[in-house]
Amino acid sequence: MGVSWPAKVRRRDGTLVPFDIARIEAAVTRAAREVACDDPDMPGTVAKAVADALGRGIAPVEDIQDCVEARLGEAGLDDVARVYIIYRQRRAELRTAKALLGVRDELKLSLAAVTVLRERYLLHDEQGRPAESTGELMDRSARCVAAAEDQYEPGSSRRWAERFATLLRNLEFLPNSPTLMNSGTDLGLLAGCFVLPIEDSLQSIFATLGQAAELQRAGGGTGYAFSHLRPAGDRVASTGGTASGPVSFLRLYDSAAGVVSMGGRRRGACMAVLDVSHPDICDFVTAKAESPSELPHFNLSVGVTDAFLRAVERNGLHRLVNPRTGKIVARMPAAELFDAICKAAHAGGDPGLVFLDTINRANPVPGRGRIEATNPCGEVPLLPYESCNLGSINLARMLADGRVDWDRLEEVAGVAVRFLDDVIDVSRYPFPELGEAARATRKIGLGVMGLAELLAALGIPYDSEEAVRLATRLMRRIQQAAHTASRRLAEERGAFPAFTDSRFARSGPRRNAQVTSVAPTGTISLIAGTTAGIEPMFAIAFTRAIVGRHLLEVNPCFDRLARDRGFYRDELIAEIAQRGGVRGYPRLPAEVRAAFPTAAEIAPQWHLRMQAAVQRHVEAAVSKTVNLPATATVDDVRAIYVAAWKAKVKGITVYRYGSREGQVLSSAAPKPLLAQADTEFSGGCAGRSCEF
């Protein structure tokens, strides 16, 4: 450092940080690249001139930026100065917008992320104003979760709170939304989702409905198997009347979820599963196909078996069984029912399929029962009253010097497993059955987000063999690290109570019956500023609805690449926004077009291949949408569903573009056409309920 340079920089919030001339040089370099100024010595020369002009002491950040503008002007670099000034103006506008929202954002999140955090995550004072900053939100969650550490090593919670906070503040790992929302609050419910049982009695149906309302009020999602309810028209001995059937109660549950969500912090999200052998399966399959607005809070999935799908393949008959009596009440061609499922999914995305036999072959505690349902997005098959405590590693933050930082990935995975295990201990459970089930198996779900961004940063097309191989390797390493961490926790704290009844009883003890699961990540990937789960990018440039306006947004990875390589232009971005993607766009280099495919530009087979590759190293399940073009046929849906079964994934969802009104990503903007996204959309399914 020069003897006459500043020692410190005063940020806008008043904090002091060391002066770093490399940051000035990097900013000038980015501006120079945008105007194709290829003098390699210029940025360093300008940065040194700025440092010399500032002198010793403490330099306010605004003074530094003013000095950069002045030195560029003096050097006759007017084009570079113009780009630098525009960048400053945009940053100033962003700070102003955040200030108008009343949010202090030391994490430098996107405006969309800050908007969502303000509405649903940050604590507020009595006047409704945010009472904490974005960083303080992360600190609150870290402290709350780390409190569990004192149960096992008194006095250790402060140390672990600091480690947890580092992960959260760096956006290297984020837990599911309720952990961020409810940590340190009176609600205290930190688990993301639950499966609740519904038995064949009015008492059970309404008792479960009441429990669901309590969970949804606290931001928890709920999954149900309606398979035990007697079919419509069946005899009710106590009244002499007839049953209304599971679909009628499904509508009741949906209405209740809508009412609860009005007073809650996010829209109610639910999953309904009905066994393919239920006599009312045809009504269930078409429950949402008849009206796009029907059952808005529910995802629907048919619980299919290997026997049913083999009957489809050989054009055999399928038996429908009354769950009350266990007797066969009808037989129908399996292919006819499968066609009805595929037609409904083609029409609106529902129902998906849940492969019950595949799920139960991997059930870690088969002695505790057969799994019949999943959480709302399908990534965690659960027994009754079990919960999913989810968190995701941000793969986009696992890069160093243009390569995957495998050591950091394993370190983050290990700390994340400990975090999620602590969540089980500190979470409050509204009903004793929930706490008992959570502690019995201590299931957690460590997953990922940012896969598509990582691939793009490495120049690897999502729809390529190289991408599938890398995704496989990433998930294998994460699962191995998670297993190691869970075994270490078992040595410190003991195995999960149901260990002796588990598939692992003959192997070494584990703290958790399940450690990995890949969630869609929904809002948390938006907060982290990366792509959702293992989904591809949904658009490269688009407009996002924020506080009543549609603001142009560019994928951050593409934005950085375009500026670094010198082809960023405002008119270029406007053209891309009209298209959504860049595949087939002649103005960009071929390798850039290949590395930035959008979900709609990727063939369905590649979507499924990626899901299957990741599933091989995930103990629970993988939430992934197979996107289909608007021109896709029912036969295309049929082919994907069969291929998914044979690929041994645990569930499958398809979404044909434009098949549902109100989808959260569309090109239905006024002329000129622009890809549009809702405030909270970060990728994945553009039509189903994916709040988590």
From Swiss-Prot:
5'-deoxyadenosylcobalamine (coenzyme B12). Keywords: ATP-binding, Cobalamin, Cobalt, Deoxyribonucleotide synthesis, Disulfide bond, DNA synthesis, Nucleotide-binding, Oxidoreductase. Induction: A member of the dormancy regulon. Induced in response to reduced oxygen tension (hypoxia) and low levels of nitric oxide (NO). It catalyses: a 2'-deoxyribonucleoside 5'-diphosphate + [thioredoxin]-disulfide + H2O = a ribonucleoside 5'-diphosphate + [thioredoxin]-dithiol. It is an enzyme of class 1 (oxidoreductase). GO terms for molecular function: ATP binding; cobalamin binding; ribonucleoside-diphosphate reductase activity, thioredoxin disulfide as acceptor. InterPro entries: ATP-cone_dom (IPR005144), RdRp_reductase_class-2 (IPR050862), RNR_lg_C (IPR000788), RNR_lsu_N (IPR013509), RNR_NrdJ/NrdZ (IPR013344), RNR_R1-su_N (IPR008926). Residues 7-95 form the ATP-cone domain. Its cofactor is adenosylcob(III)alamin. Disulfide bonds join C193-C388. Its EC number is 1.17.4.1. One of its GO terms (biological process) is DNA biosynthetic process. The active site is at N375, C377, E379. The keyword Nucleotidyltransferase does not apply. Substrate binds at S177, G192, C193, G221, N375, P376, C377, G378, E379, P520, T521, G522, T523, I524. It holds the Pfam family Ribonuc_red_lgC. PANTHER family: RIBONUCLEOSIDE-DIPHOSPHATE REDUCTASE, VITAMIN B12-DEPENDENT RIBONUCLEOTIDE REDUCTASE. Provides the precursors necessary for DNA synthesis. Catalyzes the biosynthesis of deoxyribonucleotides from the corresponding ribonucleotides. NCBIfam families: NrdJ_Z (TIGR02504). Belongs to the ribonucleoside diphosphate reductase class-2 family. This is Vitamin B12-dependent ribonucleoside-diphosphate reductase.
